[in-house]
Amino acid sequence: MSDALKKSIVDAIEEGQLKLGYREETIRLYYPLSSLCTLMHQSMDAAQMTRALTTFSEQVKGELGEIEVSRKGERFCLAVGPKGAAWVHEHTDPSGFLADFIAAIGHHGCTMDELLAIFRRHGGRVHVEALHNGEFDWLVYFEDGKPDAYCYCIADEGCHLTYHRFTKEDYEAFGFETT
């Protein structure tokens, strides 16, 4: 089983539940083949990945329930059923870093200083880097990967901040230039 893929699924569902609230419903997550290969720690073509994901879904069925796998070309959809949504809701921390981060960035007028204070409150060494790539203004992450190992790309939209978070591997694959 791919622990990295399971973690990615759980983290994405948790993020959605923190933003939108919990509902016991099917959640669809979309992944490009390249990201799945990274999470599965091996290179595969789309047909091989479909088979690997079918096996993976059987392995995590006890926790995440049924996961329906579909694809169009090299874009995969993992439809995690209501049982999986409930399991994530019951097994994640509603008061941790991500909850604090999402609550802050969801408020109109949130500042970068407020977000950095949250990062620093939840982790030791925080990497902060100005970006000039036309897409994002800052790259922020926990250098030791705790409490999470995602790269947070933050953009100042004038009246509010927005973000996307990526695995380090996906972020590096984008090839964004930094200062």
Spans of model-derived segments:
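Positively charged, polyanion-binding regions of nucleic-acid-associated proteins
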Residues: M1-L29
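Short secondary-structure junctions
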Residues: L20, G62-V69, R120-L131, T178
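Short glycine-rich, basic-tinged beta-strand/loop micro-motifs
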Residues: R23-S43, L98-A104
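Charge-enriched amphipathic alpha-helical scaffolds
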Residues: I27, C37-E66
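Charged low-complexity interaction tracts in eukaryotic proteins
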Residues: E58-P94, G134, W138, H160
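Long, charged/polar, surface-exposed segments that mediate recognition or autoinhibition
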Residues: S95-F119
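A cross-family detector of function-defining hotspots
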Residues: T111, A117-Y152
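Intrinsically disordered, low-complexity regulatory segments enriched in Ser/Thr/Pro
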Residues: K146-E177
